[in-house]
Swiss-Prot record:
Source taxonomy: Bacteria, Bacillati, Bacillota, Bacilli, Bacillales
An example Gene Ontology biological process: lipid metabolic process
Official protein name in the record: Glucose 1-dehydrogenase 3
Residues the record marks as active site: Y158
Record family assignment: Belongs to the short-chain dehydrogenases/reductases (SDR) family.
General remark: Prefers NAD to NADP; very unstable compared to the other isoenzymes and 2M NaCl enhances its pH and thermostability.
Binding annotation for NAD(+): 11-35
Assembly: Homotetramer.
Key words of the record: NAD, Oxidoreductase
Organism this protein belongs to: Priestia megaterium
Keyword RNA-binding: no
GO molecular function: glucose 1-dehydrogenase (NAD+) activity; glucose 1-dehydrogenase (NADP+) activity
Uppermost EC category: oxidoreductase
Length: 261
């Protein structure tokens, strides 16, 4: 646990499910004030809010589409209005849908790029704007993927969004380091999240993925949440412009480098 995270105001996009929910609960355990953004499932968001509060934190929920500029502006401003400030912005909302590249529609391409990359840019921009205007040494954490560095069949749009995020994060980190604002990525590998539930329910597919992970198992959302808490804490005060991979060593596995699909 990180005592300096108590009462910090943390905004998490896509915070009602999967990795976002795990991070929300972890910051609740740290007694932070958590702003849970959700897209359309209010019941799920309310459940996440309750879980954060039961863990020891405070929480509010804010509906919004991260691809819409006005929604992201509202999200950040609501956090500031409700809790008085902003300390940590976690751009976690993301989508993926494997499609053969020659069959990928422009609408599908745009949906993934707009959600994963543009959404993260908007969240980063609004948070950094507030940090700069108020002389706050704030923290931005973007949820990337092992695919920011590893190509993968059927994921051209997703890999492009994460590769773009890598350069965006590094550029922002360099630009705002003199102001004490830190910007980092987390790069999860294969995770036990709702988006992967159907795939990993198949023993054959699960075993195939596990065979590419040196540590031998599919990651838990709580393991990514632990990385987020570290990066948000003062223990990571000299860390900026990196991607911290939580992948069980997957990016180092030789066959993974070939883009097995």
């Amino acid at each position: 646990m990180y005592t300096d995270l108590k009462d910090k105001v943390v905004v998490i996009t896509g915070g009602s499910t999967g990795l976002g929910r795990a991070m929300a609960v972890r910051f609740g355990q740290e007694e932070a004030k958590v702003v849970i953004n959700y897209y359309n499932n209010e019941e799920e968001a309310l459940d996440a809010k309750k879980e954060v509060e039961e863990a020891g934190g405070q929480a509010i929920i804010v509906q919004g589409d991260v691809t819409k500029e006005e929604d992201v502006v509202n999200l950040v401003q609501t956090a500031i209005k409700e809790f008085g400030t902003l300390d940590v912005m976690i751009n976690n909302a993301g989508v993926e849908n494997p499609v053969p590249s020659h069959e990928l529609s422009l609408d599908n391409w745009n949906k993934v790029i707009d959600t994963n990359l543009t959404g993260a840019f908007l969240g980063s921009r609004e948070a950094i704007k507030y940090f700069v205007e108020n002389d706050i040494k704030g923290n931005v954490i973007n949820m990337s993927s092992v695919h920011e560095m590893i190509p993968w069949p059927l994921f051209v749009h997703y890999a492009a969004s994460k590769g773009g995020m890598k350069q965006m994060t590094e550029t922002l980190a360099l630009e705002y380091a003199p102001k004490g604002i830190r910007v980092n990525n987390i790069g999860p590998g294969a995770m036990n999240t709702p988006i992967n539930a159907e795939k990993f329910a198949d023993p054959v597919q699960r075993a195939d993925v596990e065979s590419m992970i040196p540590m031998g198992y599919i990651g838990k959302p709580e393991e990514v949440a632990a990385v987020a808490a570290f990066l948000a804490s003062s223990q990571a005060s000299y860390v900026t412009g990196i991607t911290l991979f939580a992948d069980g060593g997957m990016t180092k596995y030789p066959s993974f480098q070939t883009g097995r699909g």
